[in-house]
Each structure stands twice: as structure tokens, then as C-alpha cells.
């Protein structure tokens, strides 16, 4: 089998590419980073290093890459030959990926699975809609399968730019009925994906974001330093207790099952062999304060059902306080707040009502 994976970054190489390669799939990465593309085509291999005490290392072999900006015809041909097409580029870039993908899928005569591996709810649907806007209806042998992905891959540098450090834990869940052909090892196939996507997003991503925003507020620079601060861990647990209420109510996980999941996630955040800059975790504040994202979606549910939501209210306020002049979304956030105020910002970007916006603003003013 052959796969084309859009995004040769750390997630692409250290998670999706590794799993595909472990299934004896020939992986071709597509990226615009010339240094990464050239290195992949020179070495045809790289190391994935686990963030455990032994630094367990595996070598991913037989890979190559295409510079999608410089060689679109080669990418088009690779897409025509692919059995699997995956992405890990960030959900905001999926419409751009669709422009490369659409002509090949329109022309393609053989079955293919298309899977967007992004930190977003039903990201493959987002990609599919962008493709169909270009192509119109596609034949039945083009299979779009939603997925949920979970693996912490920190910002890092290595002597070999291809090598990547990842946490030992990973989870890749895919819609079973949308997938065509043999199921791959190390991927969990389920009938209903949404509980897994939302549980991950509202636990891992909500928690990670809280650590970033509260951590910076309390003067920390890394996830490990922040989670070692009792104030941050206490606030994190309050937030995850609240999102757990949403998850249990919506999807029927038992209280014990969700509590065990939360403890596992907090344990991952505390991994002494793995830390990350808060600026990498915190960036993209406009997306992360969105109405369907990790903070506002559970907060709105709890607010509307008159359930405890003080932790999430604080998380939203910490996000509003967050500073990073290298992140364009945070710069835009700060400019909008300065010109229009907190309530106007929350109405525009979080799309919440005035009363909940006032609650968040009150906490913001007390910080």
C-alpha cells in the first residue's frame, strides 16, 4: 500500500507517518519546507524517540517527500497512486490542501481512504466539504473517514532535523464504516467517533490550553514547570472536573471511566521526560476561544444547564490575558480587545451571550 501524508512536521513524522510505516505502508510526505523535504529524500529514514527514561528509539525507513509548492505534478501523480491520504497540517490549512487534493480525487480511478488527523471535531468532514466545493460529487470509491488523534509532540530541535521526540502514549481512532479495505494495526476503529473526539478535545486539549494560559499568568515558561505549580494543577483539576460533567452527560461514559481517563491525561502532562514551551501550546487563541472549541463548547453547555463552570470561566479569562507577540492570533486578540473591549471580543469570537461574557470579564478584571 502507498500513502501520501500532507504535513511533514513533528506530528506527521512522529505519529501518523510512524503508524503507517509500521503497517508496511510506503509513505510519501508532502510539505513546503524545503529543508525537511530535501532531508527526507536524501536519507529516506528518520528516528522516532520515545520520551521515556530509556529514550526508546525506532527507525522509520523507506520514506520520501514531495515539495508541493515546487512539484505539484509529482504530488498529483502520487495522489493518483495512493491507497491512503492523510493530513496533519492544522485544520485552518485544510482548504488549501483541498486545492491540491481535489483534482487528483476527481481523476482517481482506484479506492482511497482520506483521513484528516487534526485537533478538531470531524476534521475530515471539513476537508471533504472543501474538496467537494471544487469537484462536485465524487465517486463512491473515494472514502472520507473522520478520525481522532492524540499524541503529545513538543517543540524540539535535534542534530538531525528529521528525528522527532514523542510521548509513549498515542491514540488514533477512525470511523469504521467509512474506512475502505483492511484495517490497520495500531488504529482503533469504532462505530461512533464523536465521543472519542470530544472526550479527547475536552480533556487533553482543554487541559493543555489551561496549563498554557494559567501557567504563563503564574510566571512559568514550560508545561512541566506549570503543572508542578500547585495553583495550576488545582485549577486544571477543576477545569477537567467540569469538562468531565459535559462528557459524561453527552456521551454516557461512566464517572469512574472518565475519572480514570482524566488521571491518565494529567499523568501525561507530568511526564518528566517530556516538556513543551507554553507558547507552542497556547498559540492560536482566536481558534481556541471559538464557540465549538475546547473552552467555550463545554462552558456554554454547563452555563446553559446551570452547572458549575468557574474553572472554565477562569480558563477563558486566562486566555484573554495571554501574551505572545509572535502569534498572529494573539496579537489580533489583543488589538481587538484594546479597541472594542472584552465583552465585544467574546461576542464576536466566542459567540456567547452577554451574561456569560460578563462572568468571564469579571474574572478577567480580578486577575
Curated annotation (Swiss-Prot):
Instruction: Tell me which UniProt keywords the record has, alphabetically.
Output: NAD, Oxidoreductase
Q: Which Gene3D superfamilies match?
A: N-(1-d-carboxylethyl)-l-norvaline Dehydrogenase, domain 2, NAD(P)-binding Rossmann-like Domain
- Keyword Oxidoreductase carried by entry: yes
Residues the entry annotates as binding NAD(+): 3-14
| One GO cellular component, as annotated | cytosol
The UniProt entry, under SUPFAM superfamilies, shows: 6-phosphogluconate dehydrogenase C-terminal domain-like (SSF48179), NAD(P)-binding Rossmann-fold domains (SSF51735)
Q: Mind telling me which InterPro entries this protein's record contains? A: 6-PGluconate_DH-like_C_sf, 6PGD_dom2, Mannitol_1_phos_5_DH, Mannitol_DH, Mannitol_DH_C, Mannitol_DH_CS, Mannitol_DH_N, NAD(P)-bd_dom_sf
**PROSITE patterns to which the protein is assigned, alphabetical:** MANNITOL_DHGENASE (PS00974)
Q: State if Protein biosynthesis is listed as a keyword.
A: no
Q: Which GO terms describe its biological process?
A: mannitol catabolic process
Per its record, the protein catalyses:
D-mannitol 1-phosphate + NAD(+) = beta-D-fructose 6-phosphate + NADH + H(+)
Q: EC annotation?
A: 1.1.1.17
Single GO molecular function? mannitol-1-phosphate 5-dehydrogenase activity
This protein is called Mannitol-1-phosphate 5-dehydrogenase
Amino acid at each position: 500500500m502507498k500513502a501520501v501524508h500532507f504535513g511533514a512536521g513533528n506530528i506527521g513524522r512522529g505519529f501518523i507517518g510512524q503508524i503507517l510505516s509500521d503497517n508496511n505502508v510506503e509513505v510519501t510526505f508532502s510539505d513546503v519546507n524545503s529543508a525537511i523535504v530535501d532531508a527526507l529524500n536524501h536519507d529516506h529514514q528518520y528516528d522516532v524517540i520515545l520520551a521515556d527514561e530509556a529514550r526508546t528509539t525506532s527507525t522509520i525507513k523507506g520514506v520520501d517527500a514531495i515539495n508541493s509548492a515546487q512539484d505539484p505534478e509529482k504530488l498529483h501523480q502520487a495522489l493518483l497512486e495512493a491507497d491512503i491520504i492523510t493530513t496533519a497540517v492544522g485544520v485552518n490549512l485544510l482548504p488549501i490542501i483541498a486545492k491540491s487534493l481535489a483534482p487528483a480525487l476527481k481523476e482517481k480511478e482506484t479506492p482511497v481512504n482520506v483521513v484528516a488527523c487534526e485537533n478538531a471535531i470531524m476534521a475530515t468532514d471539513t476537508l471533504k466539504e472543501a474538496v467537494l466545493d471544487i469537484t462536485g460529487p465524487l465517486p463512491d470509491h473515494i472514502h472520507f473517514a473522520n478520525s481522532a488523534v492524540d499524541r503529545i509532540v513538543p517543540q524540539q530541535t535535534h542534530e538531525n532535523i528529521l528525528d522527532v521526540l514523542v510521548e509513549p502514549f498515542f491514540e488514533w481512532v477512525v470511523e469504521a464504516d467509512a474506512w475502505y479495505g483492511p484495517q490497520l494495526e495500531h488504529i482503533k476503529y469504532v462505530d461512533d467517533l464523536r465521543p472519542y473526539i470530544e472526550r479527547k478535545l475536552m480533556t487533553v486539549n482543554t487541559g493543555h490550553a489551561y496549563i498554557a494560559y494559567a501557567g504563563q499568568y503564574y510566571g512559568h515558561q514550560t508545561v512541566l514547570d506549570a503543572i508542578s505549580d500547585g495553583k495550576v494543577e488545582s485549577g486544571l483539576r477543576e477545569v477537567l472536573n467540569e469538562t468531565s460533567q459535559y462528557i459524561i452527560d453527552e456521551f454516557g461514559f461512566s464517572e469512574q471511566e472518565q475519572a480514570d481517563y482524566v488521571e491518565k491525561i494529567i499523568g501525561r502532562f507530568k511526564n518528566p521526560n517530556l516538556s513543551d514551551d507554553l507558547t507552542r501550546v497556547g498559540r492560536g487563541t482566536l481558534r481556541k476561544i471559538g464557540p465549538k472549541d475546547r473552552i467555550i463548547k463545554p462552558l456554554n453547555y454547563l452555563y446553559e444547564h446551570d452547572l458549575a463552570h468557574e474553572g472554565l470561566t477562569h480558563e477563558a479569562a486566562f486566555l484573554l490575558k495571554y501574551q505572545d507577540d509572535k502569534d498572529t492570533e494573539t496579537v489580533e486578540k489583543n488589538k481587538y480587545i484594546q479597541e472594542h473591549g472584552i465583552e465585544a471580543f467574546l461576542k464576536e469570537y466566542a459567540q456567547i451571550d452577554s451574561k456569560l461574557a460578563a462572568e468571564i470579564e469579571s474574572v478577567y478584571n480580578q486577575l
